[in-house]
Amino acid sequence: MTSKTNFINYFLLAFTLAFISSGLSAGTLDFKDKKKDKEKKEELTADGPYVLYQPDGQIRVINVDKKGNIIDTTYTTLPQNFTLHVTDHKGRFPFDVKLHPVKRPGWNYPQADKVFVMSDPHGRLDCVISLLQGNHIIDKDYKWSFGKNHLMIIGDIFDRGKDVPQIFWLFYKLEEEAAKTGGHVSFMLGNHEPMVLANDLRYTKEKYKILAEKLKMEYPRLFGPDTELGRWLETRNTMQMIGNDLYVH
């Protein structure tokens, strides 16, 4: 009787383990399928703008509106007071950007009264805006309000989020605004900048791959040396001094 009971117990245990194992396998497969389905369903959202300088001297400006429509315009010459209009991927946080000469920043700056250091925005414009406004670095119109102080961003704007070029444009704009008041904005390269520019897109949102596919180009081409953001990025430092402090990613 005891051996029969033991046999039944072993049988039930084996059956239960097999059932749990099959459930876990099915759950794993189901999770992978859902992830693939999510990637397939991801669509274009508000993005850009991307400014590309053509070999014939024309300027191509690419935007995506919040409905996912690609607006691709080529100019023989840019209109006077040409302005880029930027929003996040949902059409929020609107600000304008005017192109300005790109200069390589210095690597050694004097100590400012205040230095605000941030890192790894990873495509989250909403978080960047909240952080900068909460610390009185920008005002309600997203303009520089940090006076003669120094904003330091230690890399990694690319990947994970859906507002990558928008964050680049914000710092591009603030850099010029800060300089006019005696302040400084320093954006340094992290590890994700060279990764993406080398076409390593492991952590890049699917929407960017979809955009590149629709434009019939590789994604890094939108930040190449013949683009405005690409020219700005290629001048960024990988390490920098402020006073006696060394900053690296």
Whereabouts are the PLM-identified features?
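Bacterial Sec-dependent N-terminal signal peptides
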Residues: 1-30
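Feature recognizes metal-dependent phosphohydrolase scaffolds
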Residues: 26-248
